[in-house]
Amino acid sequence: RGPDAPGPASKRVRTAYTSAQLVELEKEFHFNRYLWRRRRVEMANP
């Protein structure tokens, strides 16, 4: 979205992961390069 784009700019909220969650994400990523949104949400909200 450029500065001249019409309409309100909606930014996605970033998820802050704990160190333990990052380790789990890295393990998952090792086996599967793409983590579905559902899986990321599951890992973010234990």
Swiss-Prot record:
Family annotation (Gene3D superfamilies): Homeodomain-like
GO molecular function terms listed in the Swiss-Prot or TrEMBL record: DNA-binding transcription factor activity, RNA polymerase II-specific; RNA polymerase II cis-regulatory region sequence-specific DNA binding
Positions of transmembrane segments: none
UniProtKB keywords: Developmental protein, DNA-binding, Homeobox, Nucleus, Transcription, Transcription regulation
Presence of the UniProt keyword Nucleus in the record: yes
Localization per record: Nucleus
DNA-binding annotation, residue ranges on this chain: 1-46
PROSITE patterns found in the cross-reference section: HOMEOBOX_2
InterPro entries noted in UniProt: HD (IPR001356), Homeodomain-like_sf (IPR009057)
Pfam families recorded: Homeodomain
One GO process term, biological-process aspect: anterior/posterior pattern specification
GO cellular component terms attached to this protein's record: nucleus
Disulfide pairings: none
Function: Sequence-specific transcription factor which is part of a developmental regulatory system that provides cells with specific positional identities on the anterior-posterior axis.
PANTHER family xrefs: HOMEOBOX PROTEIN HOX-D3, PROTEIN ZERKNUELLT 1-RELATED
Family: Belongs to the Antp homeobox family.
Protein name per the record: Homeobox protein Hox-D3
Organism: Ovis aries (Sheep)
Gene that encodes the chain: HOXD3
